[in-house]
A protein has these predicted regions:
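Helix-biased "structured C-terminal domain" signature
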Residues: 1-480
């Protein structure tokens, strides 16, 4: 519907593209974000993110494109359970599932293809919901371009996860070797805020330019971003603009004391030392990337999730084995994803089996999973008891609390207990401002509430970025 833009003191531009109600109902999001070194680039980025989210979520929700089956029943499928398990090898909850059980569980599968174009099937809903660090959704000018962008994204996440988990001390890029005027302008903008910028080589020896930017916003906290590109310049600009973009996120700040290696200057290299994979076409770049991951002992799978109505090429990418960025703060583990998928395909027996066996670290996990299983069995009254108990526990996982408040609030709304419904709504907004859950609690017309909730989200976004909104095209606020 609209785009909202603002300019960071570093000179980078950021955009929030406001989706229509249809976008919201499919993705659960109000907006999509973009950033760039100019207005058009930021606007373009937000619209591409809008397109990729809409296309991918719509594809995964399409039952006509979902095949319910198991590893055992999908004979001669190129994608094996080893490809799935390789990306969660560090997850302790994996021991709760026996290999033969995983082979027999019914899952939702989507048609994909490997690096050679061979048809195969992947449980993409499970991958998209759980393995966030190893799947990439990207839009492009062509399907090959979308595949390149998606593959670069998963390689970025894999590199960052490897650096974080192993505590690797990578080379510092000498800022004197940076000649690009746009990059130098952004860095100077950061310095004008009193921030210090450390640019590091995150390529990990792969023939792919990968740059990490660690920016100290004060002596104790910093922001870290990693980006790749076809050239060192492209990777640097992407990492710098993303670093400015995530500044408004309160949870993106890291402690300097816990990651001192990002500020070490023991080993320096020139940005010219980074590899260059630029080629004449997206297909040539894609072939180079496929060769790179193959030489690293990795397998890559793609899925064309382009929406016919939109007509914008979108691809999902899965890389195995790949390191997954930890999701522990949101309670995501292998069991989390598997139980959710089993409930989606109505395999209550399989979900119940895992639920009984799992010895979760805290009681809130049991209460959450048990409540969701009862919801799937249409035993809402029993489920509500578990959700009420969960809210009484000292639960640190926001998603568990959000879901519990949602079901309790919906129940109160249906019973016309406006006071309790309002209490649950207020609690939801405090946990997650702009959450789509209140749309189901506020009134009988979600379409009307959608507009109100969307405006609330926009105000919160503007409030987060208020310190960086400058005089912009004659208006002393963010441009609509």
């Amino acid at each position: 519907e609209d785009c909202y833009l603002y300019r960071h003191p570093s000179g980078t531009f950021h955009c929030q593209a406001k989706g229509a109600y249809r976008y919201f109902t499919i993705t659960g999001n109000f907006f999509a974000s973009g950033r760039g070194i100019c207005l058009d680039q930021a606007r373009f980025g937000s619209l591409m993110e809008l397109s990729e989210r809409y296309s991918a979520f719509k594809f995964l929700a399409n039952l006509k494109k979902t095949r319910i089956s198991s590893f055992d029943r999908l004979k001669n499928n190129i994608f094996t359970k080893e490809h799935l398990l390789a990306n969660c090898a560090d997850d302790p909850s994996l021991s709760l599932v026996k290999p033969e059980e995983l082979s027999g569980f019914r899952l939702g599968w989507q048609k994909c293809f490997d690096s050679l174009g061979n048809i195969c099937y992947l449980p993409l809903r499970l991958i998209a919901d759980f393995l966030e660090g190893s799947n990439g959704i990207a839009a492009g000018f062509s399907l090959e371009d979308a595949m390149v962008r998606g593959l670069l994204e998963v390689i970025e996440r894999d590199s960052l996860a490897r650096i974080e988990s192993a505590g690797l001390n990578t080379a510092l890029i000498d800022d004197r070797s940076i000649e690009d005027s746009q990059a130098k302008k952004i860095i100077q903008g950061f310095l004008s805020l009193g921030h210090s910028v450390f640019i590091r080589d995150f390529s990990l020896g792969r023939p792919l330019p990968m740059i990490g930017v660690a920016r100290k916003v004060d002596p104790s906290k910093f922001l870290l971003t990693v980006s790749s590109g076809l050239t060192g310049r492209e990777a640097l600009l992407r990492a710098l603009t993303e670093n400015a973009q995530i500044e408004s996120g309160r949870f993106n700040l890291r402690l300097v004391s816990k990651k001192p290696r990002y500020f070490s200057a023991k080993h320096k290299i020139s940005i010219k030392d980074l590899p260059n994979i630029k080629a004449g076409s997206s297909k040539q770049v894609l072939d180079r990337l496929k060769e790179t991951v193959s030489n690293c002992g990795m397998a890559v799978f793609f899925c064309d999730v382009t929406d016919e109505e939109l007509g914008i090429p979108v691809a999902m990418t899965y890389l195995s084995p790949a390191k997954v960025v930890s999701q522990k703060e949101e309670g995501k583990d292998f069991i989390f994803g598997l139980i959710d998928e089993l409930l989606r395909v109505n395999d209550k027996k399989g979900a119940g089996l895992l639920l009984k066996r799992a010895k979760f670290k805290d009681r809130t996990r049991f209460l959450f999973y048990r409540g969701n299983k009862l919801i799937a069995e249409d035993k809402k009254e029993q489920a509500l008891c578990y959700f009420r108990q969960l809210l009484k526990e000292n639960c640190s996982i926001s998603r568990f609390k959000e879901d519990s408040l949602y079901w309790l609030g919906l129940d109160a709304f249906k019973r016309q207990d406006k006071r309790k419904a309002k209490d649950y709504l207020t609690a939801l907004v405090k946990i997650k401002p702009g959450s789509f859950y209140p749309a189901f609690l506020y009134c009988a017309s979600p379409d009307r509430f959608f507009k109100d909730a969307q405006q609330l989200y926009l105000k919160l976004w503007l409030a987060d970025n208020y310190g960086y909104i400058r005089k912009f095209e004659g208006e002393d606020h963010c441009q609509k």
